[in-house]
């Protein structure tokens, strides 16, 4: 009886929590795939144009 309670009260909730943790990552990946290629290209080009720091902070690292 104790083993059955342990399984249902401890192990089963732990297994379900682990599965719930995977869902936001999959949802984020689905959102990225829904972008059309032009939007995706614009996001990537915008990110590439950004500098890593201001010129007054670093001169040769960027």
UniProtKB/Swiss-Prot annotation:
- Keywords annotated in UniProt: Cleavage on pair of basic residues, Disulfide bond, Neurotoxin, Secreted, Signal, Toxin
GO CC field = extracellular region
Q: Which Pfam families match?
A: Conotoxin
Its subcellular locations are: Secreted
Lineage: superkingdom: Eukaryota
- What's the domain remark here? The cysteine framework is I (CC-C-C). Alpha4/3 pattern.
Q: What is this protein called?
A: Conotoxin Mr1e
């Amino acid at each position: 009886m104790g083993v059955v309670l342990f399984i249902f009260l401890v192990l089963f909730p732990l297994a379900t929590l682990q599965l719930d943790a995977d869902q936001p990552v999959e949802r984020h990946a689905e959102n990225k795939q829904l972008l059309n290629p032009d939007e995706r290209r614009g996001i990537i080009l915008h990110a590439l144009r950004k500098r890593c720091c201001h010129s007054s902070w670093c001169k040769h690292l960027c």
